[in-house]
Amino acid sequence: MMLRTAFVLLTIAASIGRCLAADPRYPDWPCAQAKVPDISLAAVWAGPPLGEAEQKWKDDPKIGALVEKAAARRLPLEDAQKAITDFLSRPGIDKMTTGKLLFAGLFEQLNAERSSVMSGLERVTRKQRQAAEKIRSDTIALQALQDATPPDQPRIDELGNQLVWETRIFEDRRRVVKFVCEVPTTIDQRLFALGRAIQQEIE
């Protein structure tokens, strides 16, 4: 039984390094989705040039508060869009100026959040690479123990259990990474949708 377990673990360890990164330009990028380091403004905003709004949006506390609220992914997109529409529909407001300030804030905030998520994914990849090497070396050590005469059964059992635990953690992380790989695209889509809501109000 333990020999079969060792064989399975060795097979897993041998395949780990090949599946950590799909793009040779970004060796720590673990996702099947292509890595796009930054959101292009033109891809998410078809409105007027933002100009000074890119620097000035933080000067207005109300803009900053709405940016924080609308950017948060825990807030349903429809609620974020409604908050933006309500904000830009207030009497006497300069929709064009306010809309540009608001989008400039959303663009900066969500781009920063996206970069943080991507950096986190690459940190996990580096940890996974180290974990893969540990699994590989421990598997080889387990095979050596099993081949020894006489076998050290307590040590075999200890190392075998350790390997099962290490592999379980590795697989759990891999499942989490697969889920988190969707987040940058989700952020892109949210930013585009919020930008459209602003544009519809200022057109």
Spans of features found by a protein language model:
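Non-transmembrane amphipathic alpha-helical segments
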Residues: 117, 124, 128-146
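Short, charge-rich amphipathic alpha-helices with coiled-coil/heptad character
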Residues: 89-118
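Alpha-helical oligomerization segments
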Residues: 154-203
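Bacterial N-terminal signal peptides
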Residues: 6-15
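Positively charged n-region of N-terminal signal peptides that target proteins for export
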Residues: 1-5
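N-terminal Sec/ER secretory leader and immediately downstream segment
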Residues: 21-96
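Short E/K-rich amphipathic alpha-helical oligomerization segments
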Residues: 137-165
